[in-house]
From Swiss-Prot:
Superkingdom, natural source: Eukaryota
Source organism per UniProt: Caenorhabditis elegans
Name of the protein in its database record: Uncharacterized protein K04H4.5
Length: 251
């Protein structure tokens, strides 16, 4: 908070008596006469009548008291800074601490030290001054197969439970063999899908025929519609629709 010193300026004696500044000074007798005529209050230094603010702890009555208070605050701050170093360790103790840290820290190249002086926070543990991380482990990978069955994946020590869809026969779902229609409407007929179907206990996903193609009609059509009722993404196309963006031969 800044303090403003207010005072009044009186006209100078030379201006009051019509004197101008020049090298030709009047004699000493004339100056003594002027000094006797001028009021004594003008000679004394002007004193401010500032009494401080109500928010101050000790409002200064005069400017001199304010300066003294500021000087005391500065001296107290300097003494506080000096007292901060009163409990500093000696050089011998510092060297001993450095030796202890070097003895604790291992020389293993796999241990990465994350403590950087000046950039990282100081270590919080007192036994080991340097924070290290030596357990580098990758997360466990689990292979997942895309199947048409929906599973409830539980914990590692629990068994997963298969969730049946609407109008689905559990005996038909658990059978590892594929019917003739399912083999025809498979998305791809490569050896990869056949090996996955033989090795896996689950049925592989059948995405249906290409757009615009009709599957071979058989007595299994009703069961296929009920089978794909729950999942619309795997429902085969049963309506012949010609594409406007491709040749009829490609449909």
């Amino acid at each position: 908070m800044g303090y403003v010193e207010s005072f009044y300026l009186e006209p100078e004696a030379t201006q009051m008596f019509g004197m101008t500044e020049s090298n030709d000074l009047p004699p000493l007798e004339n100056l003594q006469e002027l000094a006797s005529v001028i009021d004594v209050n003008i000679k004394e230094p002007l004193v401010s009548d500032y009494c401080g603010l109500e928010s101050d702890d000790i409002p200064p009555i005069y400017r001199a008291q304010l300066r003294a208070a500021q000087k005391e605050k500065i001296i107290a701050a300097e003494q506080a800074d000096k007292s901060f170093y009163a409990y500093e360790k000696s050089d011998a103790n510092l060297e001993g601490d450095k030796k202890e840290v070097e003895a604790i820290a291992p020389v293993d190249s796999m241990n990465f030290e994350y403590y950087v002086p000046g950039f990282s926070p100081p270590p919080q543990n007192f036994n080991d001054d340097v924070q290290k991380m030596s357990n580098f482990q990758l997360p466990k990978m689990t292979s997942i197969e895309a199947t048409e069955n929906v599973f409830k994946i539980n914990g590692a020590h629990e068994k997963s439970q298969y969730v049946l869809m609407e109008n689905e026969d559990p005996n038909k779902v658990n059978s590892p063999k594929k019917t003739g229609l399912e083999s025809l409407i498979s998305y791809t007929a490569s050896d990869v899908t056949s090996t996955i179907a033989s090795e896996s206990s689950c049925l592989t996903a059948t995405l249906g025929p290409a757009f615009g193609c009709l599957p071979i009609t058989s007595t299994y059509d009703r069961h296929s519609e009920s089978k794909y009722k729950g999942l619309s993404a795997f429902r085969p196309v049963t309506k012949s629709i010609e594409s406007q963006y491709a040749m009829p031969e490609l449909n």
